[in-house]
Amino acid sequence: MSPGLPVSIPSQPHCSTDERVEALAPTCSMCGRDLQAEGSRLLPCQHLLCKDCYQGFMQELGHATRAYPGKLISCPGCQRVYLTRDVTEHIFLQCFSPVKPTMARNCSECKEKRAAHILCTYCNRWLCSSCTEEHRHVPAPGGPLFARAQKGSSGVNGGSGDFALYCPLHTQEVLKLFCETCDVLTCHSCLMVEHKEHRCRHVEEVLQNQRMLLESVTSQVAHKKSSLQTSAKQIEDRIFEVKHQHRKVENQIKMAKMVLMNELNKQANGLIEELEGITNERKRKLEQQLQSIMVLNRQFEHVQNFINWAVCSKSSVPFLFSKELIVFQMQRLLETRCNTDPGSPWSIRFTWEPNFWTKQLASLGCITTEGGQLTRADAAAASYGSLQGQPSFYQSHQAPMAQQEALSHPSHKFQSPALCSSSVCCSHCSPVSPSLKGQVPPPSIHPAHSFRQPSEMVPHQLGSLQCSTLLPREKELACSPHPPKLMQPWLEPQPPAEQESTSQRPGPQLVSQPVCIVPPQDVQPGAHAQPTIQTPSIQVQLGHHQKLKLSHFQQQPQQQPPPPPPPPPPPQHAPPPLPPSQHLASSQHESPPGPACSQNVDIMHHKFELEEMQKDLELLLQAQQPSLQLSQTKSPQHLQQTIVGQINYIVRQPAPVQSQSQEETLQVTEEPPAPEGPKPALPVDKNTAAPLPQTSGEETPHSVPPVDGTSQHSSPNVVRKHATSVSIMGFSNTVEMELSSTRLARTIEPQIHRVSSLTAAPTHTIPSLLSGPPQTVSSLMSVSNHAMPSLTASHLQPVPNLVRGTFQSTSNLRGDSSQAITGLASNHSQAGPSLMSGHTQAAPSLATCPLQGMPPVSDVHVEPRSVSSPGSGPAAESLGTRDGAESSLGNALCKMESEDCTRFSDSVGQGPTASSLDGPKDLAIPSELEEPINLSVKKPFLAPVINTSTALQQYRNPKEYENFEQGALELDTKENSDIRAISSEPKIPYVRLERLKICAASSGEMPVFKLKPQKNSQDGNFLLVIECGTESSSMSIKVSQNSLPDASQGPGLGGRKVTVTSLTGQQPQEVESTSEEHRLIPRAPGAKKNTPAPIENEDFCAVCINGGELLCCDRCPKVYHLSCHVPALLSFPGGEWVCTLCRSLTQPEMEYDCENARYGHPGVRVLPGLSMYDQKKCEKLVLSLCCNSLSLPFHEPVSPLARHYYQIIKRPMDLSIIRRKLQKKDPAHYTTPEEVVSDVRLMFWNCAKFNYPDSEVAEAGRCLEVFFEGWLKEIYPDKCFAQPQQEDSDSEDVSGESGCSTPQGFPWPPYMQEGIQPKRRRRHMENEKTKRVSFRLANSISQV
């Protein structure tokens, strides 16, 4: 293809924008400056050079300005070599270069070059005011004037025909023909002269053929590019995996070092204490003997002095008188015996085996690899390549013979470093063989790259470690070796030739000491005894599991009889090892181990690693128990971060042997990943909760969530949380709800419409429903528990029921300009808020009974609106309780009072709800004996009391619950005789709440309800405060009234607008009710409505909540943009149209005009993907998520500027990616529904992993996940989808600088070698991590 052919490429209409921008890069590849229209060069590799760089580059190569053909030129960008004749002028830049703002603003027509005022867009010339009048465009047919005006400039439309390239020979002729024989562009004149007999065609025909060829080539390039991106992503994941594994093993080694140091200090301190005890006992005995001798000596001196004085005195009579006493005393002293034997010389010494412990330290641990082919030659090449500054991945292609030699002679390539600087370091060490000198690798090699195996250690190298115990400390330090780092010591046995050569060398012949390992019996009391595994000639090199006392390992007496000469050590120490001679005798008859023995050793290694790490975790859990009690809701991965600190990884891989008891023990200390399949909710009601022998004092707020449904009843290690329900007006039965982890609840009612908020309800508070006066009650009531901050915040099954209606007009009822009453009922884990509006000033109630003195009006039973599908119907608010934190609602009296304080003689038990008072201690007490609670300021005006009684029956799903529970709502309306008097002065509501008989919680405190007006009472803003001890919660209540109703309307709703606000940031939804429609008519409980309400479409798109050109569904109120709908539509349909949520899956009413429909036309090769049935189901799932108001943060990817997000989240996922992969033309199109569900769950998992559990985004993600699982169960009722496994990674240490996938595509690393060098992150101090953890815990406590 000729260099001039690329001129036709920009005119292709199907060329994508990204490819066009890539081909027309505006900067020079050498200097990086903007290119000029003249003199720029285009290389065959599509790199660009400016005029100056090209000339300088050619001069540096020794060429002239005009390069000779046949010379070579190297591209400065990609280093590829081309012929200089292939470098062409950059015609693209001339064709598509924009008008520079720095161009001259002078007139191009007149000679005076006056200032230009107008730009002629037709010929791209600046004109002054005088030339503008004369400037006209009257093109003559075939005239050259128009062509010259367009020479070298883009036309008006920017098409291929507007840009003209003129012949260099015939300057007036345009190159409109293409000679296929010569492969060049030509004009008519050249065609007649040089290309007479050649095959020439018009440029447009050639463009059409070339376009088809380029499209096929472009598709192939795109496929190869996608495969390369996938491969590069996998390799990059491997790089970060290696980095993560390196940090993990490094932390394990550090932990082993720390544990060994602690054990050494403990043992040394024990020995010192033992020494002090022995010496102190010996010293005490000698001091007692010395004291007795000194006392006897003083008595002798005293008697001797007395006798001398008596003899020397001149009076003899006293001497003779006391002679007998003196003789008796002297005789007694002579007969007194005293132990004067000091005993034999007593010596004490400390004996230990330095050689044994040196060997043990030398075999402290090993580094094993699983998977991947990393030979020793590759490791050595990587080590030496890193020293020489060369990339290690090029070494394998340069010296194949060196690799074979290294593999055939591993002992010469991987000898251990010399332990002594000279052949004999001291008189007690054996000489080092001269053959070992010169084989020591350079000391600058990183120790992580040095590999050696114990079987290759020269025997007299081991012998050189055996120094005498009586040497001075300096000599012992000189002889002690550095612990070598081993790599798979048992995978490559010693060659026979090496064994023969070592057996012939002089010096003490030592082999690795056989170690017999027995599992510790005190780790698991119920565990079965594991068989003893012996490894005769292999050093079992365990990791940090050697940190405990050596009594856990029992040595068999057949192989290692205890030597009698040394004294027996304390019980906590292991028997001393064999002397070198006994080691030699016991190891001479042992053969090298086979593959089975190596596998057994590997099995034991994993088993003991798990056991010891489990013990470490238990100790850490006990040490940090207070902090753990406040962080039970955190994921297992986050729990490890807060507990272990620097230990960033804990092995959870079970050993490949029978370790059932071990796994049962691990269930107590670690939170396992979520089990597969949803966990059914418990159908808790009065009947099922009654036989539970549970009291309010038995609750255990600090508990570990159970693993699955089976372990909740069988495993004794599972701790349950008994939620104490609050008995209100006779409901004294307690409810026991089992907790699960934050991502286990997957069950939800199919009739769910929209999840709006969650409520955090502790066990000893009353999340009872409170409806305030002139405003709707918010659908979120959060009561914080400082001892247990929202243990599980995602398990609720809210079923919103919005009941709108009017009360039937009666003869004794009159219209009133009253406010709305909102009755909310929280029922177990299912919440059904029923919003009922009536003419009343204010009546906050839970559930009411008829009042005395008024004839009750006929009960009005209202059924909740039936919802055909979870996503259809108008949006409704929802109220839920967290994790079944139960609130049992009883009945309460709520009435309005005037100044005279009307007395009621009717008892509480009378009425339709008297049957619910079944508690033994809840008696029917007359209401006049109870003093009401006043929550508002009394007004001086009077009003007659009019009572209206209504009963609201709560619907319960028969599939999940077995019975119904009724709650009665009684409205007491009160009106003023003079409406003008009311409207002329400020309205202050007057509310009286009857005292509720409430069973006190375990803390013994009762809740206190306060109603406070905010700012201006005329606005209808009130604050409802609920206080229970030190905890408090509040909600804002507002009722807006559009206009005062007429008296002729009766007790209708009067066109009032009720707003239910949610504290989770969801948009308030307004429900307008009028007296002409939706009247509450007395009917049977099972009766249905006569005429359904007409569908009023929404004003904003159900997905993006924006306006514009919207497409209305004929079966539901939702409207969509064409691009927001799933699947995205290409054109507006004609006639009746239904959305994906309303369209039938089995018999669709219509087919959408979308990409998938056009992609599936006959003749188009279709890649394997979802079936049509599964495609419709998955589109319905995704659209239901997009229509949820909580899904707005998940519509688009996280901004690439949030670098911390892509450091923590390795696999970003959002709804836009899922929608794109649902298209059949996408290379990553889904093939099974499991992939769709896995991506959606991955999106929720990323949300829960990155955000704090108490944040709004995390709470929205949990609500949306519950909503999705309900839809999934409805669409796929008979299919079970596996739960995603938790990622085995630590967000603190796994840095994803370049591992994130941004929306613009795969982030390729730069060409330089520094691009693949990982950045080193600053390690945090331990105290900083502790502060950060405590700060998160404090935030989780203060969150309401």
Curated annotation (Swiss-Prot):
The UniProt annotation places Zn(2+) 1 binding at C107, C110, C131, H137
Question: Which residues belong to any copy of the Bromo domain?
Answer: 1169-1275
Q: Which GO terms describe its molecular function?
A: chromatin binding; identical protein binding; zinc ion binding
Q: Where is this motif: PxVxL motif?
A: 989-993
Where expressed (tissue)?
Answer: Predominant in testis, specifically in elongating spermatids.
Per the UniProt entry, what are the Gene Ontology biological process annotations, in alphabetical order? negative regulation of DNA-templated transcription
Name this polypeptide is given: Tripartite motif-containing protein 66
- Give the originating organism: Mus musculus (Mouse)
Please state the gene responsible for encoding this protein: Trim66
